[in-house]
């Protein structure tokens, strides 16, 4: 039986040409997660989708189909587009590439959908690096790979800002005897871990550490194929 979905909130993560006049879209939706849909005749001069299928624009989208590739139906605007420019636009592309690489089709991601929309708004108005780190943390949490940021793995004590902790994948953070001059790349200050826990990124040195920690963690999920947008960012 053909499944039909009517006017689901959505963002377009990616679009690519298909045949002479159509497009294949990668969508992010709250109740159906990542959805792949064929927009037939979307590139035609008289297409009903003309001007509607833009990235970073909140939409209401209908589709039908039983296979992984759905058939796009009605599309309506669901708010003003987020106008990203320059580095903010690259950040938006980075978010989209992350989601395409890490999300499965047809798994609901209600909270992640709202995190994504809030992140787009912050990219328009706020600090880019801090906004990306916050979204990466939220993404890991939603995927079930969130970092254990409540305490150290051995003593079960809260992090202290003047202490240092070694990151042990699949376990957590172990209190260790390291100094700020340490060149160990898997050692992080308690100050930085507390900043990540609280999603407060006012300190530039902590932000640099958190960026490395996020990359270290995400790389384990992404595998050997690098993200194209990382080569362009910062």
Swiss-Prot record:
Keyword Glycoprotein set for record: no
GO CC, alphabetical: bacterial nucleoid
Keywords recorded for this protein, A-Z: DNA damage, DNA recombination, DNA repair
Pfam family, one: RecO_C
Keyword DNA damage carried by entry: yes
Biological process, per Gene Ontology: DNA recombination; double-strand break repair
PANTHER family, alphabetized: DNA REPAIR PROTEIN RECO (PTHR33991:SF1)
HAMAP family (UniProt xref): RecO
Function: Involved in DNA repair and RecF pathway recombination.
Protein family according to the UniProt entry: Belongs to the RecO family.
NCBIfam families (UniProt xref): reco
Protein name: DNA repair protein RecO
Organism of provenance: Coxiella burnetii (strain RSA 331 / Henzerling II)
Lineage: Bacteria, Pseudomonadati, Pseudomonadota, Gammaproteobacteria, Legionellales
